[in-house]
Design a protein with these regions (language model features):
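Cysteine-centered motifs
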Residues: 8-11
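Short, Lys/Arg-enriched N-terminal segments with co-localized hydrophobic residues
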Residues: 29-40
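Bacterial N-terminal signal peptides that target proteins for export
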Residues: 42-54
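Bacterial N-terminal signal peptides
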Residues: 53-64
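Acidic/polar surface patches and capping/hinge elements
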Residues: 70-552
Length: 552
C-alpha cells in the first residue's frame, strides 16, 4: 500500500488539475490504483477502480471546499487588484429542475448549469457566500473545464449508443441504460472537480434530477456509466500542465521594457500575467501547443503595422480622454461580444456555448447523442485553441495598443526609441474604450496578456468552423442576445444595459464581427483578429477530423 496526497489548503485548482497547496489530505490506496494520476491510462475496465476514483474525488472536493472558503478574498485581489469591487449576486441557484425532461432537455439543462458555474466562478464572492472565486479563472482554464464536462457527457451517452469512437477508450454498455441519468451523473462529477466549492449546489441539482427517474436497473446503469465517463476524462487530464498557478507581474513574471513587447495595462494595473504558462498545457487533440503557431506579427516598421495602428487608434478610443470615430453600433458590437472574465459573464467560452445552444435549437438538433457530440467538438476545439493561442501570445509577447500608441514616438516608453515607424503618430494619453468592466466598480481595462493573436478571434474561429463542419454550411442565420446586453447586466457605473438582440445571416458574419469587436474596444490590432480566426479554424478542422468520429 502507498499513501497519496490529495490537495487542499492554499489551492488554485481542483483535484482533477492538481492543486498548488500549502497542505494536503492523505489517503492510503493500493499500488494498483496509482494509475489515477497517469496521463497514459486509456481504459477503465475495473468497477472497483472507478469506485475508488470517485471516492478519492469526493474526499478531495470536501477537503478543498472547506479550506478554499477562507482563501477567496485574497485570490480575488491577486487577479483584479485593488481597483475593482462587485456587488453581483450568485447565479448558481437559478436552475430549478423541471420534472419530465427528456435526455436532450437534460443535456441543455446541465450545459446551462456548467456555463453558469463558470460565470459564478468569475464572480468575487460576498460575505456569507459559500462558493470560492477563481477555481477555473480566465479563458484558458474555463475552456478546459467546459471541455472536460462535455467530453464526460458525450462519452457516457456514446457508451450507451456506441455510434462514435470513444475519446477515453470507454467500453460500450447496455443500451437500456438511462441516458438521462448518465448525463446528470457525468456532468455532476466533472463539475464537482472543476468547481469544488460549488459542489453542494451540484449535489442538490443531481439529487433533484435523479429523483425524477424511477429506480430501476436502467437508472443504476446510467449512473454507473456517467461515473465511469467522468472518472476516465478526469484521470486523463490529471497533471496535464494546468496546475501551474498564474504568475504575478513583478513577482513571478517580469515584463520586458523592449519596444514592441507586452507590458502591464497602465490604467487597470491588473496584477497577473494571465495564461503565461498555458501554452505548456497538454492539448486534448492537437499534437502540440505549437502545432499551429501563428506567423510573426508585422514588423513595427512596416506599412501593415501602421495600417493596423491607425485603425485601432481611430476606432478604439474611449471618447472621453481619447476622441474616436467609432459609431454607436460599433460601440455596441464591441461590448456585445466581450465576456472579459467579469462577474456572472465569465470568459468567452461561456458566450460561445450560449451561441452553440442557440444555433442547435434553431437548427432543431434534438438527437441527444448528436447534440452531445457537437458540444464536445466545440468545447474541445476551444480548449485546444486556447492552449495554442496562449502559446503564440507568450511566444511573440506583442504589445497591446495602449502601449504601442503611447510609446510610438521617440522619447516615449522605457527605451525612448519609439516604434521606428514614420507612418505612426503617437499619443501618450491614449485611453481605449477597453474591455467592459461589467458588473464591477472599476475602470474598463486591457486584458492582462499579450495581444497577438486574439483569444476572442481564436475561440470564435474554432466555434464557427466546428459549426460549419457539423452542419455542412456557412449560411446559417441566427439571432442572439448577449449577456452583456440582457437587460440585467450593469456597466461599471451601475447603469443597467438594455436588452439587445443581434441577427446574423451567416456564421462567417458573426465570426468576423466577433473578431472585429476587439478593435472597437481599442485592445487589439487587426492582425490579431485575422491570425486568431485562422488559428481557431485550423484547430477546429484538426479536432473535427481526429476526435469523436463515427466508428468504422
Amino acid at each position: 500500500m502507498r499513501a497519496f496526497a490529495f490537495p487542499c489548503g492554499d489551492c488554485y485548482r481542483s483535484a482533477a488539475g492538481t492543486f498548488r497547496t500549502a497542505r494536503t489530505t492523505t489517503l492510503t490506496i493500493s499500488a494498483a490504483e496509482e494509475k489515477i494520476g497517469n496521463l497514459t491510462m486509456k481504459r477503465l475496465n475495473s468497477s472497483s477502480f472507478r469506485k475508488v476514483l470517485v471516492a478519492l474525488s469526493i474526499i478531495a472536493i470536501v477537503a478543498a471546499s472547506s479550506s478554499l472558503a477562507q482563501q477567496s478574498q485574497p485570490r480575488t485581489q491577486e487577479y483584479w487588484g485593488q481597483q475593482f469591487q462587485t456587488n453581483r449576486k450568485p447565479v448558481a441557484q437559478q436552475h430549478p429542475f423541471r420534472p419530465g425532461l427528456n435526455a436532450s432537455e437534460r443535456l441543455r439543462h446541465w450545459n446551462e448549469i456548467a456555463i453558469d458555474a463558470s460565470g459564478l466562478d468569475h464572480t468575487p464572492n460576498q460575505p456569507g457566500d459559500t462558493y470560492v472565486f477563481g477555481h477555473q479563472l480566465g479563458p484558458g482554464r474555463a475552456s478546459r473545464a467546459m471541455a472536460i464536462v462535455h467530453i464526460a457527457i458525450f462519452e457516457a451517452l456514446n457508451a450507451i449508443e456506441g455510434k462514435y469512437e470513444s475519446y477515453v477508450g470507454l467500453d460500450t454498455v447496455d443500451k437500456h441504460a438511462s441516458m438521462e441519468c448518465a448525463i446528470a451523473q457525468a456532468a455532476h462529477d466533472t463539475l464537482c472537480e472543476m468547481f469544488p466549492s460549488q459542489s453542494p449546489s451540484f449535489n442538490q441539482l443531481l439529487t433533484e434530477d435523479l429523483n425524477d427517474v424511477a429506480d430501476s436497473e436502467a437508472k443504476a446503469k446510467g449512473i454507473e456509466v456517467g461515473q465511469s465517463a467522468a472518472a476516465a476524462i478526469l484521470a486523463l487530464r490529471n497533471n496535464d500542465g494546468s496546475e501551474t498557478p498564474e504568475p504575478r507581474i513583478g513577482i513571478d513574471w517580469i515584463t520586458s521594457n523592449d519596444v514592441g513587447r507586452w507590458r502591464q495595462d497602465p490604467i487597470s494595473l491588473l496584477p497577473v500575467a494571465l495564461g503565461a504558462h498555458w501554452g505548456e498545457v497538454t492539448p486534448f487533440v492537437l499534437r502540440s501547443s505549437s502545432q499551429f503557431r501563428t506567423p510573426p506579427p508585422p514588423a513595427l516598421s512596416s506599412v501593415a503595422y501602421a495600417t493596423a495602428y491607425d485603425e485601432v487608434k481611430a476606432l478604439g478610443g474611449d471618447g472621453i480622454v481619447t476622441p474616436t470615430s467609432r459609431t454607436n453600433e460599433q460601440t455596441t458590437i464591441g461590448i456585445f461580444w466581450a465576456y472579459d472574465g467579469t462577474p456572472s459573464l465569465c470568459a468567452p467560452p461561456r458566450l460561445y456555448n450560449q451561441i452553440t445552444m442557440r444555433i442547435a435549437d434553431e437548427r432543431h438538433t434534438h438527437d441527444v447523442v448528436e447534440l452531445a457530440r457537437l458540444l464536445a467538438l466545440v468545447n474541445v476545439a476551444m480548449a485546444d485553441s486556447g492552449i495554442a493561442i496562449w502559446e503564440s501570445k507568450f511566444y511573440y509577447d506583442f504589445w497591446r495598443p495602449i502601449t504601442g500608441i503611447r510609446e510610438s514616438d521617440p522619447g516615449t516608453g522605457p527605451t525612448g526609441t519609439g516604434d521606428g515607424n514614420d507612418l505612426t503618430a503617437g499619443d501618450v494619453t491614449f485611453s481605449p474604450l477597453g474591455a467592459p468592466a461589467s458588473n464591477l466598480n472599476g475602470p474598463n481595462f486591457t486584458p492582462p496578456f499579450p495581444a497577438y493573436p486574439s483569444g476572442h478571434a481564436g475561440f470564435g474561429g474554432a466555434l464557427f468552423q466546428i459549426l460549419r463542419r457539423f452542419y455542412g454550411k456557412d449560411r446559417i442565420p441566427f439571432t442572439f442576445i448577449s449577456d452583456e446586453f440582457n437587460g440585467v447586466t450593469e456597466d461599471n457605473h451601475g447603469n443597467t444595459r438594455p436588452l439587445i438582440e443581434r441577427h446574423f445571416s451567416s456564421l462567417s458574419e458573426a465570426e468576423e464581427e466577433n473578431g472585429q469587436s476587439r478593435i472597437y474596444l481599442g485592445i487589439h490590432w487587426s492582425f490579431d483578429k485575422t491570425e486568431g480566426i485562422r488559428l481557431g479554424n485550423r484547430v477546429a478542422d484538426f479536432v473535427f477530423d481526429h476526435a469523436f468520429r463515427k466508428r468504422r
